């Protein structure tokens, strides 16, 4: 891509993650949540078919989690395929087409969100989401 085409794309993607007004700000001045959203925008610049997220909210202050989840929800609504490792069970239940629950490195459930959260088969799966969702 030409240098001339980079800036408009960057601004469009920063706008998509709610940070267009921070386009001229140094990364060190951004909060953790803002830095995470910039990372998502950078990834989107590559036009991926699939986005991989590994605990995208785990290092964030609780008040910043919602902004990241909102960006991810928008990506899901736009049709982006995402593989996400998360402990955010409410998010997984709302956004996922498929939920895989792992315990000690093994897949113990692989279901639709409805099935996973209303009729889990594995004892560990039964305990975990309800414990997280009822915090």
Please provide the spans of the model-predicted regions.
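Conserved ABC ATPase signature
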Residues: 26-30, 34
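Catalytic Walker B motif of ABC-type/P-loop ATPase nucleotide-binding domains
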Residues: 51-54
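Conserved ABC ATPase "signature" region
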Residues: 4-21
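Hydrophobic anchor residue at the start of the ABC signature
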Residues: 40
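A short, proline-enriched helix->beta-strand linker immediately N-terminal to the Walker B motif
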Residues: 45-49
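H-loop/switch region of ABC-family ATPase nucleotide-binding domains
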Residues: 86-87
């Amino acid at each position: 891509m030409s240098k001339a085409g980079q800036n408009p794309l960057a601004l469009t993607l920063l706008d998509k993650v709610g940070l267009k007004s921070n386009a001229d700000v140094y990364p060190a001045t951004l909060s953790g949540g803002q830095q995470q959203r910039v990372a998502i925008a950078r990834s989107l610049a590559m036009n991926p078919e699939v986005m991989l997220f590994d605990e995208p909210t785990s290092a964030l202050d609780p008040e910043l989690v919602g902004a990241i989840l909102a960006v991810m929800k928008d990506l899901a609504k736009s049709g982006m395929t995402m593989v996400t490792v998360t402990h955010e069970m409410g998010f997984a239940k709302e956004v996922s087409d498929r939920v895989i629950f792992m315990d000690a490195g093994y897949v113990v459930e692989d279901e639709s969100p409805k099935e996973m959260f209303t009729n889990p088969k594995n004892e560990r799966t039964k305990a975990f989401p309800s414990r997280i969702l009822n915090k």
